[in-house]
Amino acid sequence: GLSGSGKSTIAVELEKMLNEAGKAVYLLDGDNIRCGINSDLGFSDEDRNENIRRIGEIAALFRDAGIITLVSFISPFREMRRVARERAGEGNFVEVYVNTDLQTCMERDPKGLYKKQIKNFTGKDSGYEEPLVPELIADTKKYTAKECAEQIFDYIMM
């Protein structure tokens, strides 16, 4: 989903639920990765692809260690999501589309990103390719973050 759609909020709720269920879990979020390992990347299509590629590699390392990895990022291109799914391996990737319209995201704008003049910002002047067949769709206009997290929790625990 777009910036402000609720991805991070849902992921934090889901992380709590998984921890309470005794699962080893780690949350990779756009904020902590963009400020660290991917701080050298901008927002060009090439940099966005590299951002998601690196995240996919990191998530695979966590998976190899037996840790459930929650990945909360703007992933604007279907092809990169396909590559990340492939890298994760069969049965190890659940795509959740946090479907929130642009206007709502702009109204929420918790980080003030829509107000900034960021070149190639997803949803503003750079496109977002909606998933064609995600495993789950989280509608944050209709449901709370906790309700969305519960839906995801139920799906991955079945």
Where in this protein do the model-derived segments appear?
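Conserved substrate/cofactor phosphate-moiety recognition/catalytic segment
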Residues: 5-60, 64
